[in-house]
Amino acid sequence: MSGFVEKPEPLQVPGLVHLHTGKVRDLYQNEAGDLVMVASDRLSAFDWVLPTEIPDKGRVLTQLSLWWFDRLVDLAPNHVLSTELPPGAPADWQGRTLICKSLKMEPVECVARGYLTGSGLVEYNETRTVCGLALPEGLVDGSELPGPIFTPATKAAVGEHDENVSYEEVARQVGAETAAKLRQTTLAVYARARDIARRRGIILADTKFEFGFDGDTLVLADEVLTPDSSRFWPADQWEPGRAQPSFDKQFVRDWLTSPESGWDRKSEQPPPPLPQHVVDATRAKYVEAYERLTGANWS
């Protein structure tokens, strides 16, 4: 069992139609037919949307995505039309709302990996492959790969888990030409972002993108290169062979699996609320990622 511990009720905003409540984002449509994407402070872990929110998280995700979009536009156009608050929207939406093009979304999570960890490490330890791609012997948790690889995954609903799939399966789903575009653009955007992050003392271990089509044009959508969609590691603490310190929700995962939480991940019971010290530390991680990447102070 998984999903929302406490599913939020969507806000009723004049002129907007609620379309979907996701793990983090609420999606609406305005009268012009554009999408209104609102990033909440919700946090998910182990396929559960937790009952405790992380203050400012949605704003950090939105502002960091906008910062990255500006630096990637020559590689991939993005879906953002405006950051103006829709008329009648609550003040709390300020800084966490994007007005976006409505796209024909591709049913694939486009994952790029430059380092081995997470589900990729699990598969590698069993088969010496990741998504069907053969990798050399001797790699450990945190190893840098010989080169970035494209390891797509299925898109899962709230409460379900993304599943890694082969490139060949993606080509069967979306067609060879589109699959090639997805792979090429994913790896190009990853390489650009990896180099930018590296200059700021951060390793971009892996990340996932979502794409859609606006006519014949492939467009980068959703969020990009945030602590929710990426693994960011401090470069000065990188040490292959162990779990790496990170600027993301790993702190929450660690607490949930610790004796302190009292939660059994294998049970069907929902996870407990987060204590204040975990909330504060997690918020600090998200803010630090924003500040180190952008060079700007969070306020």
Swiss-Prot record:
Catalytic activity: 5-amino-1-(5-phospho-D-ribosyl)imidazole-4-carboxylate + L-aspartate + ATP = (2S)-2-[5-amino-1-(5-phospho-beta-D-ribosyl)imidazole-4-carboxamido]succinate + ADP + phosphate + 2 H(+)
Highest taxon in the source lineage: Bacteria
Protein name (Swiss-Prot/TrEMBL): Phosphoribosylaminoimidazole-succinocarboxamide synthase
Keyword Ribonucleoprotein among UniProt keywords: no
Region (Disordered): 259-279
SUPFAM superfamilies: SAICAR synthase-like (SSF56104)
Organism lineage: Bacteria, Bacillati, Actinomycetota, Actinomycetes, Kitasatosporales
Enzyme class name: ligase
PROSITE patterns per the UniProt record, alphabetical: SAICAR_SYNTHETASE_2
Keywords: ATP-binding, Ligase, Nucleotide-binding, Purine biosynthesis
GO cellular component terms given for this protein: cytoplasm
Enzyme Commission numbers on file: 6.3.2.6
GO terms under biological process: 'de novo' IMP biosynthetic process
Source organism (scientific name): Streptomyces avermitilis (strain ATCC 31267 / DSM 46492 / JCM 5070 / NBRC 14893 / NCIMB 12804 / NRRL 8165 / MA-4680)
Protein family membership: Belongs to the SAICAR synthetase family.
Coiled coil: none
Metabolic or biological pathway: Purine metabolism; IMP biosynthesis via de novo pathway; 5-amino-1-(5-phospho-D-ribosyl)imidazole-4-carboxamide from 5-amino-1-(5-phospho-D-ribosyl)imidazole-4-carboxylate: step 1/2
